[in-house]
Amino acid sequence: LNGAGKSTLLKVISGVFKPTEGHVDKHGKMVPLLELGAGFDPQYTGKENIYLYGAMLGYTKKFIDSKYDEIVEFSELQKFMDVPVKNYSSGMKSRLGFSIATVVEPKILILDEVLSVGDAKFRKKSEKKIMSMFDSGVTVLFVSHSLEQVQRLCNKAMILEKGKLIAY
């Protein structure tokens, strides 16, 4: 449901917002992908943004160097690495962000409607990647308006309405 507080909840969990009450305990490296293009500089190329986003997540240049080809290959944006991100479509930004966030091997991955844009083929590929991450013990929190997608991917789900939990 729109306006239910889903994105706000993910921002609290990832530390972007402070909770008005209580606290959030996290254990392990967390990688949030909260807004389309968040963490990207639109003036920089795709390649430059891979290193920028990696640095923002706390990874060294050497580490990103070792993962660069894997990021580019998964994103399927080889021909666009030297193009400024301001010229990317929303689907291309989603591909790049998702590819970076998943290749750095977080313990907790937070995705806010990232899989709602782009083509069906890449969504399916991304869902397969998420399933393999589950198998390796990664916790994935994601927002989706697609009940079918939630049923395919999740072993637990919750529904929010106006900031209240109405189903778990």
What are these regions (language model features)?
Residues A4-A55:
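ABC ATPase nucleotide-binding domain signature region
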Residues T102-L111:
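A short, proline-enriched helix->beta-strand linker immediately N-terminal to the Walker B motif
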Residues K156, Y168:
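Short, glycine/charged-rich "phosphate-handling" switch motifs in NTP-dependent
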